[in-house]
Regions:
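Positively charged, low-complexity terminal tracts
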Residues: 19-195
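Sec-dependent N-terminal signal peptides
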Residues: 3-17
Length: 195
């Protein structure tokens, strides 16, 4: 009986480890964050982006499907271009403090976070991203709030905050679908070696 339980536990562990694979990293506020990916039960590509949470350091947002991943990436490119433009305008005009919204809409995301257990929330969106200059230092960020799907009293704010255009670019690069698919295919090939 003990062997059967161990075998089942090992099988579940290895299957779940294969389901989401770290396919890249990016930099956010000076810290390295992970991008994980996997194929969902519906066959769609899922990308999990590690962000910062209000109560939990380990928060992942899930973008489902290539169409939404492309939309998310396109909006990031627009934000990066605005960041570069407005940072230059702020420096050229000696603007040391300003907060201005960037007119983009990110696709809805699922949010997963660790508290006493794993929590999740579906169909979450970000508040309009903002460009911020504080004491001459520019940053870009957005925030969202997730409420646990089964308990309205369990919630989590989640943040994306970049301090440079290069940090934004690192996430854009990490969300390249062809690179993500390549990483997943390599993992599948390695996994299939052991038949």
């Amino acid at each position: 009986m003990k062997r059967i339980v161990l075998l089942i536990a090992f099988t579940l562990l290895t299957t779940s480890m294969y389901a989401e694979k770290i396919v890249g990293t990016f930099t956010m506020s000076g810290a390295t964050r992970n991008i994980e990916a996997g194929i969902g039960s519906n066959g769609a590509l899922n990308v999990f982006i590690q962000v910062v949470g209000e109560y939990s350091e380990y928060v992942m947002i899930r973008v489902e499907g290539e169409e939404d991943i492309r939309k998310f990436r396109t909006q990031l490119i627009h934000c990066k271009n605005k960041f570069i433009e407005w940072e230059q305008v702020a420096k050229s005009n000696n603007v040391y403090n300003i907060k201005k919204g960037i007119d983009v809409t990110f696709p809805d995301v699922e949010v997963w976070w660790v508290g006493l257990e794993w929590y999740s929330s579906y169909k979450n969106n970000f508040i309009k991203p903002i460009f911020l200059v504080n004491d001459g230092d520019a940053s870009f960020g957005t925030i969202g709030t997730a409420t646990h799907w089964a308990n309205d009293f369990i919630d989590q704010e989640f943040y994306i905050l970049f301090e440079t255009a290069n940090e934004i670019q690192s996430l854009i690069d990490a969300l390249d679908i062809s690179k993500i698919r390549h990483e997943l295919n390599q993992a599948a090939e390695t996994y299939n070696l052991f038949q």
